[in-house]
Amino acid sequence: MGVRAQQKEKTRRSLVEAAFSQLSAERSFASLSLREVAREAGIAPTSFYRHFRDVDELGLTMVDESGLMLRQLMRQARQRIAKGGSVIRTSVSTFMEFIGNNPNAFRLLLRERSGTSAAFRAAVAREIQHFIAELADYLELENHMPRAFTEAQAEAMVTIVFSAGAEALDIGVEQRRQLEERLVLQLRMISKGAYYWYRREQEKTAIIPGNVKDE
């Protein structure tokens, strides 16, 4: 990459970081202005368009980065698990670390998941589906259950984790510790329940081949 390209990428990075820094519990992405973001990044407003078509493209880039950042951290957590440790507890701890270190990135995902922009909703949904798919892959490999079971389990776990994450944004250290313990318990219940249901379906199939009743 040439010097000019490096400088352009550096400025683009500054714009993304400037936008993230201006988000807060009281301020959503929709309230940000191009001028404010450009000023925070140290460039002229007109220079913004050399890097993004408009503010929405900047926001979509931020959504993609937030999702990727979270998935990368969870991959690292699974590597730590491979060296020993509780799967669920390590994953919960890693997720809470992400929220503690990147609250605005998680706020962006939460808010735009149900925001007014169809493009933003689709982008967040896509990131969540990536997250679910990677977790389902891991569960399928570790638990040796069919894909349909691991996808259902992964979706349930991600739904609960994101809900807990929203709560974690606005509570203190001790309350967050209690939330983590509750989340670990809930995820273990889902995990045990998924395995129990799978074993039950296996037993029913063995007794009556090809005839599994949905209850």
From Swiss-Prot:
Residue range(s) of DNA binding per entry: 33-52
Pfam families cross-referenced by the UniProt entry: TetR_C_46, TetR_N
GO biological process: fatty acid biosynthetic process; negative regulation of fatty acid biosynthetic process
Domain HTH tetR-type: 10-70
Annotated function: Represses the transcription of fabB, involved in unsaturated fatty acid (UFA) biosynthesis. By controlling UFA production, FabR directly influences the physical properties of the membrane bilayer.
Subunit structure: Homodimer.
UniProt protein name: HTH-type transcriptional repressor FabR
